[in-house]
């Protein structure tokens, strides 16, 4: 899998990449990662310059949601896509919400927010090789800001973004309290993976201590994340496996 690396090992600071990691591990599919450090390098595999990119049996698969759909087709057991049409629709809505709403709050707080950007530069970007580490942070911040403005989140103030993110956490916690063990029912789905991939990043205290505290204040979310990761014992969280992440491309 082609990805942007994380703080350690083969982890990633990209929720879409983390979502694919989770799906591959859950389905027991062996894989390797290759860490890139610029969209220009990624364009060798995906003309859009976006990760993740999964290379499988001579095919190039792009877009995390499309990759999960294809993994389900090729490796149906254990399933991540429910058979029941109503549950399947709910899981799809949850995944899309995580990808198109929750994710962009995280991007804003990591790249647009001044303190979040400072932490990214000092704790993550300094691992890049010279001279990339001098150039890449500013380029990445401008690209994130531009994308967020087109998407809409970038037009909001930091105060509004943080408030709306908290409301999202409240909605998730409310859904889980006294309800089924997973977001779409009794079984893990691709919707759970999409939300967990974002919240894992937001729970990384080194980079996002404020959002980590917000998650910790909601026991239902903490318990649900633990439940999800209990089914994914070989998935390291964004900074946990202890091995430095070298860029490889």
How would you describe each model-predicted region?
Residues 86, 90-93, 160-167, 171, ...:
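A non-catalytic, amphipathic alpha-helix used as a structural packing/dimerization or gating element
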Residues 1, 39, 43, 140-145, ...:
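Short alpha-helical hairpin
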Residues 191-249:
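Extended hydrophobic/aromatic segments used for targeting, binding, or gating
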Residues 104-214:
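GST-like fold's C-terminal all-alpha helical module
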Residues 34-40, 186-188, 239-243:
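Acidic carboxylate-rich catalytic motifs and surrounding loops in phosphoryl-/glycosyl-chemistry enzymes
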Residues 1-133:
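GST-like domain detector, emphasizing the conserved glutathione-binding G-site
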